[in-house]
Amino acid sequence: MSNNVIEKVTELVQPITDRHNFELVEVEFVKEGQGWFLRVYIDKVGGINIEECAMVSDELSEILDAQDPDPIPQAYFLEVSSPGAERPLKTKEDLTRSIGEYIHISLYASINKQKVFEGYLKSFENDEIVLDYLDKTRHKELKVTYDQVAFARLAIKI
């Protein structure tokens, strides 16, 4: 059921985000404790603000309330927000847009006994990711294919 809700909400919210030139990053429908949460993550170049999140929330809420039959029969909380500083990089377009940024990647299989890397994304071409990372005090370059990456997100360098 969760996937059906996500598909339907994505279908309903995409025209709203398109109209405002926002990017629809992700839609989640999850149960936490006793409650269900419908989370819509949006962004734009330069970052999204709280007023823009509220505007999308109001528009989506109105559209969801008008649906018959109701795509979400149980009670839920609607949250519209930014994906945050450590935004997930879910698509090839996300990676291309993040060239030069500090990122975190987790691989499906270890390379030299290591699965997790953080560094600067130097390039992403022909499905090859090139990451400049520190190994103790030395800069190293990691080259992996897009298919080797289990998860990627922006990271905050400490």
UniProtKB/Swiss-Prot annotation:
Q: What does this protein do?
A: Required for maturation of 30S ribosomal subunits.
Tell me one GO biological process term.
Answer: ribosomal small subunit assembly
Q: Which family does it belong to?
A: Belongs to the RimP family.
**Location within or outside the cell:** Cytoplasm
Could you tell me which InterPro entries the record lists for this protein?
A: Ribosome_maturation_RimP, RimP_C, RimP_C_sf, RimP_N, RimP_N_sf
User: Which GO cellular component terms are attached?
Assistant: cytosol
Output the PANTHER family linked to this UniProt entry: RIBOSOME MATURATION FACTOR RIMP (PTHR33867:SF1)
Principal localization reads: cytoplasm
Q: Which UniProt keywords apply?
A: Cytoplasm, Ribosome biogenesis
Cited Pfam families: DUF150_C (PF17384), RimP_N (PF02576)
Listed name of the protein: Ribosome maturation factor RimP
Give the top-rank taxon of the lineage listed in the UniProt record for this protein. Answer: Bacteria
